[in-house]
Structure formats: C-alpha cells, structure tokens
Amino acid sequence: MTIIRLVLRAAASAALVLVALAASAAEYPEPKQAEFTARDFRFHTGEVMPELRLHYMTIGERTAPAVLILHGTTGSGKSMLTTSFAGELFGPGQPLDARKHFIILPDSLGAGNSSKPSDGMRTKFPRYNYDDMVAAQYRLVTEALGLRRLRLVLGNSMGGMQTWLWGVQHPQAMDALVPMAAQPTEMSGRNWMMRRMLIDAIRNDPDWKDGNYTSQPRSLKVANVFFGIATNGGSQAYQKVAPTRELADKLLDERLAAPFPADANDFLYQWDASRDYNAAPGLERIEARLLAINSADDERNPPELGVMERELKRVKNARMYLIPASEETRGHGTTAMAKFWKRELEEFLQAAPGG
C-alpha cells in the first residue's frame, strides 16, 4: 500500500508539474481580435483599393509600451501564438510580459483574414510587395490604434525583412528593432532561386488555369513540401529523425499526406511579394537600436556568406546574435523557438532607450 501511495503521489506531482508548465505558457491575457479598413489604399503599382481589410489581434492594454510582431510568409498573427514563441515571451516575468506591453499581431496584407486574392479578385488583386505590406501595417498602427511610436518592432522571416523596412522607412517610429531569420539585402542566390522554382511550379501547372481553377492545383502541396524541406528544418535535425532512406521516405510521405488548406493564388502572391525586397540602400537611415537574430544553420540566410557582418556596419546601433546550430535547432525555423534567444532579447531591451 505504501508503494502504491508513493506511486500515486508521484503521478499526482508529475501531473501538477505538467499543469503548471501549461499554465506558464498561457499566462497572458486572451487576444482581442479586430479589423481595420484602410480606405483608398494605394499600392506601389499605383492601383488603389477603395477598402483594404486588415485583421489583427492585440494583447494587453493600449496604454502600455507597444510591440509590433510580424509573421512569416504564409503565416498570420495567430501563427505567432505558439507555446514555443508566445509561451516563452508574453507570460509574467518574460521579455514581452503582456501585463506590461501592448502586443500587436497583424495579419499582413494578403494573409490570414486580411484582404487577399482568394476573397474574390483572384489574379486581378494588385500584385503587392513588402513595401505595400509595411505601408498597410503603418496605417494600422497609426490610424486604427493611434500610435505614433512603438517600443519594439520584431519580425520573423518575412516579418524580419519587413522589420528592416520599418527601420528604413519609418526611422522615428520605434525605440528598437529585432529582425530575425532575415537579411536586409535583396533576394539573391539559392534563396531567390528556390522561391522562383516554387512560384513557377504552380504557374506552369495546367491545373492552375491562369489562377481561375475550381479546385486547388495538385502542384501546390508538392511545391510547398519541396520548398520547406529544401530551405527549412536544419540538416542536423533532419539527419536525427531520418538517418536512413526508409525513415526519410516515411517522413516525406507523412508530409505529402498532411492536409494543406492553402489557396494557390494567395500562396503565389505571398512568395512573389519578396521579388523586389531590398532594405540595404537605406540602412544608414535607421535610428533605432537593432538586434539581428539569425541561426547558424539557416538555409535561406547562410552566415558563412558574411552578408550580415558587412551590412550591420552601416547601422548606427546594431549587433547580431547567431544561434549555434545543433540537433535541437531547425534551420530557418529556429527563430520560431524563443527559448534560443529570449535572454538576448531581454538584455537588449533593458539597454535600449526606455528600457
């Protein structure tokens, strides 16, 4: 009986620990959802949309220092509310404690519940770029929320590139910038070639029908899985989970069999939006303190090219934190796990103006 009681007590203790861990990852206020209509929105092409819908979420009180968080390609504001990201950042005592910050999570133009081709315009939707996406975000922040200055702009992957653009295009709008898994330079090398192949694979699929399909092209899922494996995940991590051909086939088959509820036109527009990205010419205009966070095994932004070291010299108050590669990191996806960099963020914010 004593042994049984000890086992039950241990099990109960373990359950309490699991409950505590789950609670600590979710101890921030419930996100509030809202929509903003940007009227007469002008795209870089000169096209004007009478009403552009921007969906967003906020956490915390508007009177607190504001933090703008920008998601990656094919993501949304909701995609940033994972245990590995929000659960490491927004809770009590964490770097972006939602009791002390006003956190803004927009769905970028073309993504989530914001205006996008699949709403009905299909390929007649303006061919937007990152500049348009940042312009929409700026109108959301200043017009819908009435904010003139942000404590922090932090973005991951596509959101990281947009963070660079925020610093260049709106240099007085924030105290601090944290672009992650992103470089300020134009698309080039393998990063662009893989994106081009992804886009062309769908556009050249007869099932796409120039964007007028009635069911999603078969190439959509294959192209997404191909691009994901080629440019994300980390070599060490893949080798760990797929050390044999049999296990590699199993992993690939599982990914190809998994549901992919995306729209081909939305998908194409989102990836194509990076085509003319280039924040590099304006780096000297950045006034905010900047912490660039990349991973040593990032397939899209390989550190061995030396791009970041060269470009950061042009930014007044900038430094980089490079996450060491390991079996735990996930290549380009590493920065989605805040455990690898949250202490760096905390120290950075303490040293930044207003910290």
Please tell me what each predicted stretch does.
Residues 131-151:
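Conserved acidic catalytic loop of the alpha/beta-hydrolase fold
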Residues 173-257:
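Alpha/beta-hydrolase-fold enzymes
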Residues 318-355:
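Catalytic active-site module of serine/aspartate enzymes centered on a nucleophile-bearing elbow/loop
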Residues 299-306:
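Conserved alpha/beta-hydrolase "acid-adjacent" motif
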Residues 57-119, 307:
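N-terminal cap/lid subdomain of alpha/beta-hydrolase-fold enzymes
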Residues 150-188:
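Conserved hydrolase catalytic core segment
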Residues 266-282:
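Active-site nucleophile elbow and catalytic-triad environment of alpha/beta-hydrolase enzymes
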Residues 286, 292-294:
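Short beta-strand/loop motif that positions the catalytic acidic residue
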